[in-house]
Amino acid sequence: MQAIHNDKSLLSPFSELNTDNRTQREESGSTFKEQKGGEFSKLLKQSISELNNTQEQSDKALADMATGQIKDLHQAAIAIGKAETSMKLMLEVRNKAISAYKELLRTQI
């Protein structure tokens, strides 16, 4: 009986596919780049900072509306809507992250 692991003819079609795929990725420039640790934390901090800025703009627009100092009601409504949408998005991202974390905790090793 012939040993399968010594038969290179079985592996040749797969090795050709692998090299073709590698050259296509290199030609198209879609290779994966290594990212430094902490990129996610920087992105998260930046997103939270932007959310905070939109919330502050919304609060200022609401305060201006309450005191009658608003000049453009349309811009105030846009700022409030933008802050509301940003907060909903951030809450959904948080919920998905918590869900993924809980799923990892349930994973058996």
From Swiss-Prot:
Location of region: Disordered: 1-38
Location(s), subcellular: Bacterial flagellum basal body
Specify whether Metal-binding is a keyword of the entry: no
Q: Does the keyword Transcription apply?
A: no
Would you name any one GO CC term? bacterial-type flagellum basal body
Enumerate composition-biased segments (Basic and acidic residues): 22-38
Single GO MF annotation: structural molecule activity
Question: Where do the TM regions start and end?
Answer: none
Query: What's a GO biological-process term for it?
Result: bacterial-type flagellum-dependent cell motility
| Record InterPro entries | FliE
Q: Keywords of this protein's UniProt record, alphabetized?
A: Bacterial flagellum
Q: Name one Pfam family in it.
A: FliE
User: Which family does the record claim for this protein?
Assistant: Belongs to the FliE family.
Put simply, this protein is called Flagellar hook-basal body complex protein FliE
Whichever gene encodes this chain, its name is fliE
